[in-house]
């Protein structure tokens, strides 16, 4: 079970009496195509109880709005009880950790913590002295020793005190590789006899995107996809997602891929090039899928479109390499996640108008099968409320 951020975040009022809600009876009375539902929800968005939680304030403390009482020790005891209960069902608990930024910074904001400890140290600044904001806001600087120490110590704290089974790093590529490797080593050193935890069973993975001020090693060697091979740390394999579905998270969601109709059943929603261009793309996308199902291993060889054996590392993908993993567990294969449309919604957006519903359902099953039958770690997005 992958939990969205569960540390103390600042975007939801912790006490239920301070949280605003919409009158659900009134909402249900509105026509299904009315704009009033979204307008009503948006009007209280800053004060309701819904937020993903990517707004860290205190890293080492469970979020109070999830507890029956945010004051006192209830949040600690209840989080531990939840993890224990999931373990009793045979389920492992992975927590989402967001060490790449903080909700606030500066000396005066009530949700600013690190800048009040040592002003200007824990956050990454540009040459003009302003905070880097490429993660969203207030990027942290794990290249600085004590920010790195905070991250490593906090991960060990969650492993030992709350018995979680794994960590999913948000925007892991904005952390230094050295930091994540130190965290791995610290966690792997935990033993049942000494710490009550078998650290060798704890899995680390994250978003290894390489962009903005950390791209290309400009700050230091970062924990991005191409740098993680051999570490045993996993990263999300967007090659599979984009090969199967088509497009990218930041492009037009109607761009097709291998399983959504590119070349074989193109939609007419947008210009995707002629048959020759689409055939070239569908072959390239197929190579991404082949490599991913073999664990995205950089040394895995397949026969390319020209009939020659090609190592996965030499197959090109948006100016980078398709294969980058040294071992299957360094690849987290997926075709949908919480950031974008659900898998079926993505298929509905991309499929040609004349594709019947039962075929769209078969496409959905086939897309899931590429994850289920691939080497590596399998990530399946099924939200629970």
Task: Pin down the residues of each PLM region.
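A solvent-exposed, charged loop/short amphipathic helix patch at secondary-structure junctions
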Residues: 23-29, 346-361
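Short, flexible loop/turn elements at secondary-structure junctions
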Residues: 5-7, 58, 63, 99-101, ...
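Anion-binding catalytic surfaces of enzymes that hydrolyze or transfer phosphate/sulfate esters
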Residues: 13, 318-346, 351
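Substrate-binding/active-site clefts of carbohydrate-active enzymes
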Residues: 4-162, 176-196, 200, 214-215, ...
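Hydrophobic faces of well-ordered beta-strands that scaffold small-molecule active sites
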Residues: 1, 93-95, 167, 204-206, ...
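Catalytic domains of carbohydrate-active enzymes, especially glycoside hydrolases
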Residues: 1-7, 45-47, 367-378
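Active-site-proximal helices and loops of the catalytic beta/alpha 8
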Residues: 16-19, 36, 171-325, 360-361, ...
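Aromatic/acidic polysaccharide-binding cleft in carbohydrate-active enzymes
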Residues: 218, 336, 343-353, 378-385
């Amino acid at each position: 079970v992958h939990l969205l951020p569960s540390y103390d975040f600042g975007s939801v009022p912790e006490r239920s009496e301070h949280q605003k809600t919409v009158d659900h009876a009134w909402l249900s009375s509105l026509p299904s195509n009315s704009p009033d539902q979204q307008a009503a929800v948006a009007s209280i968005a800053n004060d309701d109880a819904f937020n993903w939680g990517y707004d860290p304030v205190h890293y080492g403390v469970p979020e109070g709005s999830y507890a029956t009482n945010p004051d006192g020790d209830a949040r600690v005891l209840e989080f531990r009880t939840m993890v224990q209960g999931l373990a009793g069902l045979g389920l492992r608990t992975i927590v989402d950790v967001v060490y790449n930024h903080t909700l606030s910074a500066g000396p005066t904001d009530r949700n600013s913590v690190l800048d009040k400890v040592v002003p200007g140290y824990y956050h990454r600044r540009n040459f003009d002295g302003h905070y880097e904001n490429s993660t969203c806001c207030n990027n942290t600087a794990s290249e600085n020793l004590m920010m790195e120490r905070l991250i490593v110590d906090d991960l060990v704290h969650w492993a030992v005190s709350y018995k979680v089974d794994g960590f999913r790093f948000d925007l892991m590529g904005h952390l230094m590789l050295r930091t994540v490797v130190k965290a791995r080593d610290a966690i792997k050193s935990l033993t049942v006899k000494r710490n009550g935890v078998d650290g060798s069973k704890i899995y680390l993975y994250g978003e290894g995107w390489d962009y903005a001020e950390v791209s290309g090693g400009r700050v230091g060697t970062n924990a991005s996809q191409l740098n993680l091979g051999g570490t045993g740390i996993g990263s999300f394999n967007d090659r599979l997602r984009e090969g199967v579905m088509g497009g990218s998270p930041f492009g037009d969601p109607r761009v097709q891929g291998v399983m959504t109709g590119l070349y074989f059943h193109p939609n007419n929603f947008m210009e995707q090039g002629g048959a020759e261009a689409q055939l070239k793309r569908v072959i390239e996308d197929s190579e991404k899928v082949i490599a991913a199902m073999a664990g995205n291993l950089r040394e895995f060889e397949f026969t390319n479109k020209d009939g020659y054996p090609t190592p996965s590392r030499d197959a090109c993908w948006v100016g980078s390499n398709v294969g980058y993993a040294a071992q299957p567990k360094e690849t987290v294969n997926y075709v949908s996640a919480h950031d974008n449309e659900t898998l079926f919604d993505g298929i509905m957006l991309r499929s040609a108008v004349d594709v019947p519903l039962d075929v769209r359902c078969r496409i959905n099953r086939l897309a899931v099968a590429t994850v289920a039958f691939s080497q590596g770690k399998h990530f399946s997005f099924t939200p629970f409320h």
